[in-house]
Amino acid sequence: MSAASSTESVTPALKAEILAEALPYIKRFFDKTIVIKYGGNAMTDPHLKDCFARDVVLLKLVGLNPVVVHGGGPQIETLLAKVGKKGEFVQGMRVTDAETMEVVEMVLGGQVNKEIVNLINQAGGKAVGLTGKDASFIRAKKLLMQKLDAPAGDVIDVGQVGEITTIDPSLISFLDQGDFIPVIAPIGVGDNGETYNINADVVAGKLAEILKAEKLVLLTNTPGVLDKAGNLLTGLTPRQIDDLVADGTLSGGMLPKIGSALDAARNGVKSVHIIDGRVEHCLLLEILTDHGVGTMIKSK
């Protein structure tokens, strides 16, 4: 069924029921911060992009404070291919030499960030695009990545990939108070002005901790976290996550996502969700209805 015919089939009574269901959640989350990691198909499908922008604007209009952190992997790969480079990943992190860093900053801080800002503004919001270099609000240092199943100190050089050292929340708080919607590209700055590519899931998780967010919502291209049989796991504890990593169920790009989600849950973020970004209006379904659309990460 098309989006148009689906909308036309919703009766006035059902619309009223949907609004009534949302009311207690609007009251509960009023003036609360919701950090959203935006990525995957939701960033490439035109209809899903429109749904995402309208969801974010609606959340702001009913009194929540959405903060968007975005990725841009497919767009980075496209530009790398144009300059004759191929992306390389280690444990879900993009290996970033100097030339790749230029491409990453151009794509994330320019093309992708401004497209998201424009989408939200066209939907009626007031979005402001940022990177961690703005006001130096995301400070970082070179990430020394520990090899899996190797002795401590056995590290992999992944180039200009950054590890967050500090986040100054004052800029984001200032924008929230002014009814703006921050849209953040995951680029950090070093003490000597170095530029660092930081995994967007990691930035979203750390930002949620610093802002004392009510929720962290990570969009992905799957229904959530799946077991080896492809079944959705609606809730995960740290012990279960360790088991899934050990048996290889969780790997690649899901590793930083899960790690970020678990750290946030352990450090004060009240609820953390990995949801299906391919579902229309997935944010509203997760935040303002009784029916979640993914996996909830528990701190214990």
From Swiss-Prot:
The signal peptide here is none
Q: Which reaction does it catalyse?
A: N-acetyl-L-glutamate + ATP = N-acetyl-L-glutamyl 5-phosphate + ADP
For site (Transition state stabilizer), what residue positions does UniProt give?
37, 257
Indicate which residues the UniProt annotation says bind substrate: 72-73, 94, 197
| Highest taxon in the source lineage | Bacteria
Compartments reported by the entry: Cytoplasm
Spell out the disulfide connections.
Answer: none
- List the EC numbers from the record: 2.7.2.8
Which biological process terms from the Gene Ontology are attached to this UniProt entry? arginine biosynthetic process via ornithine; L-arginine biosynthetic process
Where are the membrane-spanning stretches? Answer: none
Task: Give the pathway listed in the UniProt entry for this protein.
Answer: Amino-acid biosynthesis; L-arginine biosynthesis; N(2)-acetyl-L-ornithine from L-glutamate: step 2/4
Q: Name one GO molecular function term.
A: acetylglutamate kinase activity
Q: Which UniProt keywords apply?
A: Amino-acid biosynthesis, Arginine biosynthesis, ATP-binding, Cytoplasm, Kinase, Nucleotide-binding, Transferase
Which Gene Ontology cellular-component terms appear in the entry?
cytoplasm
UniProt similarity note? Belongs to the acetylglutamate kinase family. ArgB subfamily.
Cited function: Catalyzes the ATP-dependent phosphorylation of N-acetyl-L-glutamate.
Q: What is this protein called?
A: Acetylglutamate kinase
